[in-house]
Amino acid sequence: MTKEEFIKDISTGIPDCLPAPQPYDSTINHAPKRKDILTPEEKKLALRNALRYFPKKFHTILAPEFAKELQNYGRIYMYRFRPSYEMYARPIDEYPHRSEQAAAIMMMIQNNLDKAVAQHPHELITYGGNGAVFQNWAQYRLVMKYLSEMTDEQTLVMYSGHPLGLFPSHRNAPRVVVTNGMVIPNYSKPDDWERDNALGVSQYGQMTAGSYMYIGPQGIVHGTTITVLNAARKRLKEGETSIKGMLFVTSGLGGMSGAQPKAGNIAGVVSITAEINPLAAQKRYDQGWVDELHTSLDELIPAALKAVEEKRTVSMAYVGNAVDLWERLAEKEIHVDLGSDQTSLHNPWAGGYYPVGLSLEESKRMMAEEPQLFKEKVQASLRRQVAAINKLTEKGMYFFDYGNAFLLESSRAGADILKEDGRFRYPSYVQDIMGPMFFDYGFGPFRWVCSSCDSKDLETSDRIATAVLEEIRKTATPDILGQLDDNIHWIKEAGRNHLVVGSQARILYADCEGRTKIALAFNEAIRRGEISRPIVLGRDHHDVSGTDSPFRETSNIYDGSQFCADMAVQNVIGDSFRGATWVSIHNGGGVGWGEVINGGFGMVIDGTEEAERHIRQMLLWDVNNGIARRSWARNTGSMDAIRREMERTPGLCVTLPNLVDDDTINTAF
């Protein structure tokens, strides 16, 4: 397709002439068939909802076609309308646009749907089994058309993938406001998502999938590397300094979980990652994110033990069921240093977890045709997995929940995962590592994308970020030196670690001072022409302020407010009027639908004074909202961090907690 044809296709939106039906591409990793949950009348409603995107003249052709999709896949994806052009992040100037900010958003959307990036690209799923950008291809086409014609005096409103329309606003308003899965709380159970999504009225946006901010598995590699590094450091005996030769066992090679073997390599350990889907395993192998593929445990385990003995850094994938791996390790009493799990247990009944004893295809059939039996199989499998993990932890393994609802769903399955007091046997990685060491001090997954799609601009940005962090380190307080050192090492090695999949993007854990100074330096470099085109700033929702999630991001909040969502909601509101180019707020993400409220932003910076003002105003709020909340929860690191920020920032005045002696409380009752 020529550039002119691409521009015409984008600008057209839904075409006047029906495109030809497209054959089902078996080389692509497709979403499993979803649960058949709609009543006959609801199926008619789903069809009526889908057809409202199209003129009446197409209805007699599309109605039976969409009804068949609903029957075969449990959803109406509108495959016929999938574009014929290749889907990937193009340089910003290749998109038809009246607003440069809108062109940047188009680039970010296409990156989320790139087949090298997305888990189920033809079903518009970026990661996590159900993390959707849109519900169907008509929505994609309409959104791209709106973005191509909007101005900086308009805002596009997005309801769970559906473009409500362009509304008049002003230059400093967001260009796009996104909500995903915003349902009445009493109707926020997993089956409610199944029903609403099948009807075409709501979607699960995960975090960066539905907010157009995914940057491929690099986005989670850094956080996973930090987690593995610090988990491994917990295992060091007195006098030891090297973690080489430690064995890390986990599961999942999907859009997010695929980061684990790469993170293991960067950390310097031996890793084994189980993945039941051979297409997913092969994809990570082809991308160089896992070193070896094994289908036999009899071959894999001796190879891993040899690597441990040699203190060799290597990542191995077991193409098979995770429970088989865990049970064999327990049976053979293999010493495992670190254990975790990153199957998509936020979505356990619809492809997020495949039970032991069933093949991949058997599972796909059963979850669609016998959902109750499939649920029983999943829960039995979790009980077996936990039993094996418990045996290994009794022998000294450090196991942590990686925020995928493993502990939560295992407890619901009746697994031996609870202590006598009702708390989980094992910590969330946020409780033990990410919360007290990073979030409480404002460190989180800051990221940027070069809209030129030029690797030279990314290299320049890496050098700028390194110089900024090294300068900050000179006067940093001792409690954040370790965090700075790990991140300086990360950014210096980023190019050599070949982290880019999709757009020219980088992730870097930084605090408020770091994010702001790096962004201002980027803006100045764009102004001077050292970076050729605008940069998109953003972050994962999994951050200091962006997510209220009692089993993950806010699991180290102990004042009882971990089930409250004021922080995430306030955050997106505050970002929207302080300079964000787009904002989003989602139900679900990470741990699952009904368990989380999370939000994010994107900000296009272009070297202007206006961009500088937005950077200073918005990033300060985006980080310190969460630090202030964590400080009020009496988290020591946050109390120190917010005091330092108030000293630095005129106009910032945060309510601080008064600490009470235990004796005062105990003698009051």
Task: Please provide the spans of the model-predicted regions.
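Hydrophobic N-terminal alpha-helices or hydrophobic patches in metabolic proteins across all domains
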Residues: 192, 239, 285-289
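Solvent-exposed alpha-helices and their adjacent loops that cap or buttress functional pockets
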Residues: 148-151, 167-172, 181, 186-187, ...
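Small-residue-enriched alpha-helical segments and adjacent helix-cap loops
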Residues: 535, 539-570
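Residue-level detector of anion-binding/catalytic polar loops
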Residues: 270, 335, 398
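Glycine-rich beta-alpha junction loops
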Residues: 278, 320-323, 342-347, 403-409, ...
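Active-site/ligand-binding-proximal alpha/beta "capping" segment
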Residues: 315-343, 350
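Catalytic or ion-translocation cores adjacent to nucleophile or general acid/base/metal-coordination motifs
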Residues: 205-229, 233, 244-247, 253-313, ...
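Long, compositionally biased, glycine/small-hydrophobic-enriched stretches that function as flexible linkers
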Residues: 1-198, 202-213, 217, 371-521, ...
